[in-house]
């Protein structure tokens, strides 16, 4: 599978890792990335800074939850289940 990182290749499967993988999936497509920025009002700088903030990472997953097709596609692309992403969001929210 080349250089693509998948959740099933991560030993920990930790919430931050899953959120970052999902964010990477979101940003890997120009249309999806543009939609994320337009709907959230975030800038590219906001995204970079948010990548270290558990609350913001949780919001990226919540954003995916708002459109089930994207949640399922992201989970599939990163080798996780939609439930794992939702659980990661819950864990990240606990950290805030």
Where are the predicted features?
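Metal- and O2-centered redox machinery and metal/ROS homeostasis
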Residues: 1-96
């Amino acid at each position: 599978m080349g250089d693509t990182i998948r959740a099933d290749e991560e030993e920990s499967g930790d919430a931050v890792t899953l959120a970052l993988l999902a964010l990477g999936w979101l940003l890997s497509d120009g249309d999806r990335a543009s939609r994320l920025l337009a709907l959230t009002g975030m800038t590219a700088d906001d995204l970079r800074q948010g990548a270290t903030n558990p609350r913001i990472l949780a919001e990226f997953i919540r954003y995916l939850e708002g459109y089930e097709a994207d949640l399922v596609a992201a989970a599939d692309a990163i080798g996780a289940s939609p439930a794992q992403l939702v659980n990661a969001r819950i864990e990240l929210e606990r950290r805030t």
